[in-house]
A protein has these predicted regions:
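Short, low-complexity disordered leader/linker segments with a strong preference
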Residues: 1-46
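Extracytoplasmic "Venus flytrap"/periplasmic binding protein-like
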Residues: 73-143, 177-186, 288-291, 306-308
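Extracytoplasmic/periplasmic substrate-recognition and gating elements
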Residues: 75-77, 178-179, 260, 264, ...
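Extracytoplasmic/periplasmic solute-binding protein
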Residues: 152-162, 167, 192-251
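Glycine-centered hinge/linker elements that transmit conformational signals in sensory
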Residues: 195-196, 243-277
Length: 411
């Protein structure tokens, strides 16, 4: 979510879509290939694309149904929102770029990270929301005044953030305690002590518990999953450098000393890294690793398998040099954008804005974000998750979410 712009990833997505754009033009030269929303009588149909995930589709479909039933109009015409999942292959970014090129892009979609938004903004494909009163109102309602600054692109705002997943360490609590530690390490010295003790007890206590490896990270040996360095490299890199970026615009500005320190931290695992694929390591009766990168979207799965936060696993902050240093971390965070395209009428754009305004206005935003949290177990981008009473019950029920929320300000 922070300053890093995924230049290489976006370039790759663009290259992949280039070969398919030719065969996806408008049928007959005048009409879009897909059935694009538009004004019909006194109804304006607005297309909304969700992430290619069923749980997110279900959430937005329920919001669209409620909005449609409310009978909201613009200039006397009723707005109806139609929801569908965006294309997933070869990537959602490629699907959006193809839709832009072929005039089949929706009026609005979710699932846009800041890096891809920068690419879209540079090509004039999305609206700048900075001067919109409704956008400012939403930021205020969600207490996002500090967070939104990290989403700025050349001083402008093109994305309404929806959710944030801080990527931090997820520790095997039972294994930690067996090694003699009551909490997750915070500093390099504490981290080193834990890994050193693991190595000393690997063939004894750990073997008896079924903990065979220190770190689960199969993507480390897979060149085709290079993007996972955002998680296993950037998280320690940001924490150890005080939040320094490693890409600014199209320029690599990697801090050499910080990069070496991040690799040295990962190197402490030595030959005890589990690089083989395991479908869901944390749902095993006895997880076979000491630590992984967390996966917030799996919280419900853990609960279904009777895993208890604080007993079976615990989140640990990004590792810092010294006690008291800010634990900056990478975050998987995405939001909404409104598309500019000749196939999208002014009425459709206005209708899309009305829908998003209704979902996130002062009266609805807290309930919307609570519904999102309950549906996805992914943290909504808000500045009051641990303070707003409406979230108190779910945070009490899900202490793991409350723990993740503490990492949001540093993402």
């Amino acid at each position: 979510m922070k300053r890093m712009k995924r230049v290489v990833a976006i370039a790759a997505a663009a290259a992949m879509t280039a070969s398919v754009m030719t065969g996806c033009g408008k049928s007959g030269g005048n009409e879009p290939a897909a059935n694009h929303g538009g004004a019909s009588g006194e109804v304006v149909s607005v297309d909304f694309w969700t992430a290619p995930q069923q749980v997110q589709y279900n959430f937005w479909e329920s919001k669209a149904q409620a909005f449609n039933e409310a009978g909201i109009t613009v200039d006397g015409k009723k707005i109806e929102v139609k929801v569908q999942q965006m294309p997933e292959s070869p990537s959602s970014e490629a699907g959006i770029q193809n839709a832009i090129a072929t005039g089949t892009v929706p009026a609005v979609s979710e699932n846009i990270n800041r890096g891809f938004a920068a690419t879209l903004a540079a090509s004039g494909a999305v609206y700048d929301l900075s001067g919109e009163t409704w956008f400012t109102d939403v930021i205020e309602a969600r207490k996002m005044e500090d967070t939104i600054t990290n989403w700025a692109i050349d001083g402008k705002q093109y994305v309404l953030p929806v959710y944030v997943n801080p990527m931090i360490w997820q520790w095997n609590m039972k294994a930690l305690k067996a090694l003699g530690f009551d909490s997750a390490p915070k500093t390099v010295a504490e981290f080193t002590a834990v890994i050193t003790e693991f190595a000393a007890q690997r063939d004894t206590t750990m073997k008896e518990m079924g903990v065979t490896h220190s770190f689960y990270r199969p993507s480390l040996t897979r060149p085709d999953q290079w993007w996972d360095r955002w998680y296993d490299f950037q998280m320690p890199y940001e924490a150890l450098t005080g939040g320094k970026p490693w890409v600014e615009g199209n320029k690599l500005v990697l801090d050499k000393e910080g990069a070496v320190e991040a690799f040295e931290l990962i190197g402490l695992f030595g030959n005890s890294i589990q690089s083989g694929e395991i479908s869901s390591i944390w749902t095993e009766a006895n997880p076979s690793v000491l630590v992984t990168i967390n996966a917030p979207w799996e919280i419900s799965l853990y609960r279904e398998n009777n895993k208890v936060y604080g007993e079976d696993y615990i989140y640990g902050q990004a590792i810092v040099k010294n006690d008291g240093d800010i634990p900056y971390n990478f975050a998987d965070s995405k939001g909404l954008v409104f598309y500019k395209n000749k196939s999208i009428t002014d009425e459709e754009h206005a209708g899309a804005v009305e829908f998003v305004k209704w979902v996130y206005n002062k009266e609805n935003s807290a309930q919307t974000d609570l519904d999102w949290l309950n549906a996805t177990t992914m943290l909504p981008v808000r500045g009051d998750l641990n303070d707003n009473e409406i979230f108190a019950d779910v945070m009490k029920e899900y202490p793991e979410l409350a723990a993740l929320a503490e990492a949001v300000p540093y993402a």
